[in-house]
């Protein structure tokens, strides 16, 4: 596996953290725009508030990222509490378990799946009243206090139309806010400057500019990029597996076609993103256990248009075209534009073969994985019919076992262990006590978490 590992090691990051975040927000907006705009308003206000507080111990970009994703639990179907992620009348602030469980999911998703790490613990007790004592022992309580205040203000502005904030912001949720941060917010919002930005929708561009300045280390950026695959799980687990496997096959085929590191990086990024538009495809279609009707197939095929919309302006144009064309065929029988082979680039041809190889060799909602012989037979026929490039498909036909072995090797590297997220969330769902502050205090250590050890006994 040394050669495929070398190819993997040669890849360079194409998308910046800012671009990844923008793309991810468009994905979430494809599920529920109201929740996404609530997050945007919250993040904008949290950014401005944090700057006003001027506490060097606060990580502004992490607070903004937490704010943007703090409602992730609302984007997935919840069969236990009968929640549909497409609902328009959302309750964000109840202390009932049907609500608090969503923030617990967000907490552990962001802890294990993003660079936020322990900062995400700010969401664990998100809907509980502000605790002044906890603020002195756990920095996450500060993050929570900032984001919660801004989320409540976001909700108030949304539900009260043209009204401005009450003179005393504490009236929105008596006993739930940090008075220090309320004072800081009033300073930041002097003459209603922040509220006016939100009412005029000018805050989005301003926040977007800040998001573009966010930086992370390469390994942390890779974690963020994987969100673009794993957010698909809010609609279909099969689609997540397929996106990873198609990326593995693309890398194997690209390496055999002699692509240089720059070309391999473009191909791999295209493969990671190739089905991103399925986030906007109805779940009933993605998970349908049989052959789709012509009408539903038309809806399914529209995912390439959704991909183009989601990636537009946030991704190099060539990668967008690779994604948009991954269902085109050399003989013009593909979709959406029936582009012929003379107009399809080498990378687009490779991505098509990788996508088909994964589709045939994976289990899907409507089929089990095909046998090696059946997979080869289908690819052979598609090649003979002029749909696939024989210079590429020959590697699948002649070196199938090795390519599959490479896929399995790469999959273990590229996939993320989601079990910890599910374990913590399940533990919360199926216990009566829920998450107690004690669990956080047990993990407090050093000067980062405890400002005054002598006060700990007073809690």
Q: Regions from the language model: what does each represent?
A:
Residues 2-459:
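Histidine- and acidic-residue-rich, metal-dependent catalytic cores
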């Amino acid at each position: 596996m040394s050669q495929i590992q070398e190819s993997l090691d040669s890849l360079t990051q194409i998308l910046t953290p800012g671009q990844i975040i923008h793309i991810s927000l468009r994905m979430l907006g494809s599920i529920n725009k109201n929740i996404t705009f609530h997050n945007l308003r919250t993040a904008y206000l949290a950014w401005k508030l944090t700057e006003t507080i001027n506490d060097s111990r606060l990580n502004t970009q992490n607070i903004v990222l937490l704010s943007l994703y703090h409602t992730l639990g609302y984007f997935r179907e919840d069969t236990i509490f009968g929640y549909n992620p497409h609902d328009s009348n959302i309750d964000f602030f109840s202390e009932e378990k049907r609500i608090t469980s969503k923030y617990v999911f967000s907490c552990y998703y962001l802890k294990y799946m993003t660079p936020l790490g322990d900062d995400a613990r700010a969401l664990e007790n998100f809907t509980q009243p502000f605790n002044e004592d906890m603020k002195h022992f756990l920095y996450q309580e500060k993050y929570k206090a900032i984001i919660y205040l801004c989320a409540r203000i976001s909700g108030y502005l949304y539900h009260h139309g043209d009204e401005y904030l009450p003179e005393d912001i504490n009236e929105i949720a008596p006993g739930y806010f940090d008075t220090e941060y309320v004072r800081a917010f009033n300073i930041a919002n002097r003459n209603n400057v922040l509220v006016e930005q939100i009412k005029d929708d000018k805050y989005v561009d301003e926040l977007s500019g800040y998001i573009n300045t966010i930086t992370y280390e390469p390994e942390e950026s890779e974690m963020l990029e994987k969100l673009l695959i794993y957010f698909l799980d809010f609609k279909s687990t099969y689609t997540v597996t397929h996106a990873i496997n198609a990326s593995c096959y693309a890398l194997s085929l690209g390496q055999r076609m002699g692509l240089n590191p720059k070309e391999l990086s473009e191909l791999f990024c295209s493969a990671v993103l190739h089905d991103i538009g399925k986030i906007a495809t109805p779940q009933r279609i993605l998970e349908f256990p049989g052959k789709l009707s012509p009408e539903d197939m038309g809806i399914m095929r529209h995912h390439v248009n959704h991909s183009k919309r989601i990636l537009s302006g946030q991704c190099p144009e060539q990668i967008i075209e690779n994604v948009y064309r991954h269902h085109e065929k050399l003989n013009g029988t593909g979709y959406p534009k029936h582009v012929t082979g003379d107009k399809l680039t080498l990378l687009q041809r490779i991505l098509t073969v990788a996508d088909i190889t994964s589709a045939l060799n994976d289990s899907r909602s409507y089929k089990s994985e095909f046998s090696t012989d059946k997979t080869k037979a289908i690819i052979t026929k598609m090649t003979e019919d002029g749909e696939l490039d024989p210079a590429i498909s020959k590697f699948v036909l002649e070196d199938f076992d090795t390519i599959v072995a490479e896929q399995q090797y790469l999959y273990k590297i590229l996939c993320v262990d989601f079990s910890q997220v599910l374990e913590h969330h399940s533990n919360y769902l199926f216990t009566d006590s829920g998450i107690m502050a004690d669990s956080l205090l047990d993990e407090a250590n050093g000067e980062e978490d405890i400002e005054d050890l002598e006060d700990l006994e007073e809690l």
